Amino acid sequence: METFVCLFKDSPQQRSDAWHAVRHTQVGGSDLASILGLNPYKSYYITLAEKANLFKKNLNRAACSWGTLFERVSKDLLELFCQTTVIGDNIHIDGTYLGYPGHSNSPDGFCYLTLGYTQQSWEIKTIFNNVCYEATKRIPVLVEIKSPYNRKIKNSVPSYYMPQIQSGLALSPPISMGIYVEAMFRVCGIHQLGWNSETNIDIHPPESMLPLAWGIITICSTQEHTEAPQDFGTLDAETFRQLLETLYQKDQYTIHYSMPYETACPEMPNVVGYFGWKVFIFQIIPVMKHPQFLKDKYPIIQQFLRDLHTIKASPSPMETYEKICCSEESPLSTEDIDNFTDMLT
């Protein structure tokens, strides 16, 4: 696993300008559900228009900031709960090296997990499993992390995330299993941190269970800031949403993370404010590699790239785009979509 990750140490770092530029010319793992007709929120043709720069992405900036903030926390918790280390969380895997030019994947990382065998099945070993296993083995896995802002968490992988995971597995030959990590975080004031269910109930519904862990996210200005830090964990829902949208402008702020179970605010310069977090659900769902996934779906990726090239090369991109939308049928039939969803779930 380490040798494989090192192959991409010089690739564009995730969320860098170079990474954004490359992704604009490729079909990334997160684009796949849309072009395969599995994304209920975005279609093949909307994705095509975005890649062709015909209009800007309609981003939910608050939800994007939330996911980015808590991706790092989720990695820390995964390392703690599974006694592992996540690597390769900043690489970009270009599919050209495997014969899939124009396709790429930017995984949330790779790590080793211990599987324990009991009652005729294998399960992922965590610090919460007080089990004497008949046998154990350690395997490398691909990591995909989601931290929904307000979507309810279910004990399964949403079908529109499966293509992203299968893409990462297909472009990672040494890895045969992925894990889908989904966590439910809640915001709280600093005074609410600790072994209790208290959270900011203006932002989230009340919780009745105790948290698995908690910590502090500190927000610092990149400019000199001398005002007293604010406890953002006590804001009302709308003001906190506005804060998340402000944090989307990453060049204005730096983010610092406490270790899990910290309750004291750190002392550092230019602190604008901080807020506490608690995690109440932390799911780790195994996903096995589907060997034929990328081979079967690559023709649709190629069709998308041809459409994209046609639009970009046209002297009238919008007119060409409209012709493509009007003249082509959906890349997948309804039956294909149903069959593909059944295959992955």
Swiss-Prot record:
Family: Belongs to the asfivirus D345L family.
Protein name (Swiss-Prot/TrEMBL): Protein D345L
Pfam family, one: YqaJ
Keywords linked to the UniProt accession: Host cytoplasm, Host-virus interaction, Inhibition of host NF-kappa-B by virus
Keyword Cell inner membrane: no
Biological process, per Gene Ontology: symbiont-mediated suppression of host NF-kappaB cascade
CC annotations in GO: host cell cytoplasm
Superkingdom of source: Viruses
Native source organism of the sequence: African swine fever virus (isolate Tick/South Africa/Pretoriuskop Pr4/1996)
Coiled-coil intervals: none
Subcellular location field: Host cytoplasm
Principal location: host cell
Subunit-level organization: Interacts with IKKA/CHUK and IKBKB.
